Amino acid sequence: MPEARVPQFARRSVSRRGFLAGAGAAGLGVLATACGASAGNPATASGSGTGPWSFTDDRDTKVSVNGRPNRVVAYIGSAAALRDFGVDSALVGVFGPTKLNSGKADPMAGALDVDKLTVVGNTWGEFNIEKYATLRPDLLVTNMMQPNVLWYVPTSSEKQILQLAPSVAFTSAGVSLPSAIERYSQLAGALGADQNAPSVTDAKARFDKASAALRAATTANPGIKVLAASADASEFYVADQSVYPDLSYYQSLGVEFVQPGNVVGGFFESLSWENADKYPADLVYLDSRAAAMQPKDLAGKPSWAALSEVKAGQVVPWMSEARFSYAGCAPNIEALAAAIQRAKKVN
C-alpha cells in the first residue's frame, strides 16, 4: 500500500481515518492477489542448526542460508507469535509498536519480555538501520497487509535493510486464521522450536476448546448481531469481517457480524459520529489497540452513549491486529464466546 496512505494505519499520533485507510488500501491488494503459501501451496522448510537451512514464505520466496538463523529481528506481532511457539533466545530485536508512552509493553508484545530485546523502531516509519546492523541479524520476519509489502519496514530504506539479512514475510489479511497461525508454527519449527512441546500443544487444545465454546455460544444464543468497529475523535469505523483472519474465523463458528454496506478499499466503512447508529447491533467488538479510542475515551460522545448495545454494557475489546498463535488467539475467542453467551438482544 502506498506510504502516503499507510503511515497513518499504525501511527498513534494520527487519526483513525488514515489508520484504517491504510488497511483499506491493503485489502484491495490482498483480495485481488493470491500470494505465497496457502493450504494448496504449503511452505517448505529444511535444515538444522549446523547444516543448510531453507524456508519458503508467502511471497514464494525461498530463503536459503548455511545454518539455522539464530539471530532473528521481527515485527513485534511476528516476534510475539514466534515466542508463543517456542522461539526464545533466537529473538534479538523487534520493530513496530513495542512500548507504550508509559514504558510498559504494548499489548501487541504478548508474552515477550521487551526489556530484553533491542527495539529498532517503535512507531511507523521508524527503523534504525545502524542499530539493526549491530544486532548482526540472520533473518528478518514480518507480516504483509498487501502482497510483497513488508509491514513496518519503511520502503524508503527497505533496500538497505534487506541487504543486511534475508527476510520472511507472511500474509496477514484476506487469509484464514488457522492457516495464518500454522505459518508461524512452521517457521518456529524451522527455527528449532519443538512444536510438540506441552506449551504449544496445550495452547492448541485451549484454542480448540475456545473455538468449540464460541460455536456453542452462537448456537445457544442465536441472533446476536456483533458490530466489529474502531473509533477516533471524528469517525466510527465498521469493519468488513471477511478480510480480517480472526473475524472471518469467528463467522465460520456462527458469529453474526454486521456487514457494512459501503466498504472503502475492502476493509471498513467510515461513519460520522452523527451516523454511528446506522447499523443496529447487540454487541460492539471494539478495537482495543493503543491507537484506537476506548470506551472511557468515548464516554463523552452522546452518539456513542446512545447506542443500545453501549447502554446495555455489551462492549467487548477486540485486538484487531491478531497475534497469529494459538496462545495469542485463544483468550480472545474465550472472551467473545462469554460475551455472546450472556448478551441480550437490544436491537
Predicted regions and their residues:
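Extracytoplasmic substrate-binding proteins
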Residues: 159-232, 322, 326-347
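Alpha-helical, coiled-coil/dimerization segments enriched in small aliphatic residues
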Residues: 240-267
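Bacterial lipoprotein signal-peptidase II cleavage site
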Residues: 35-45
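Extracytoplasmic low-complexity, Pro/Thr/Ser/Ala/Gly-rich segments
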Residues: 43-88, 97-100, 340-347
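Structured C-terminal subdomain patch of bacterial secreted/periplasmic proteins
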Residues: 163, 179-180, 275-347
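N-terminal secretory signal peptides
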Residues: 1-14, 23-33
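Extracytoplasmic ligand-binding site segments that recognize negatively charged/polar headgroups
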Residues: 98-103, 146-156, 169-187, 223-247, ...
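A short, structured surface patch at a secondary-structure boundary
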Residues: 75-131, 135, 145-150
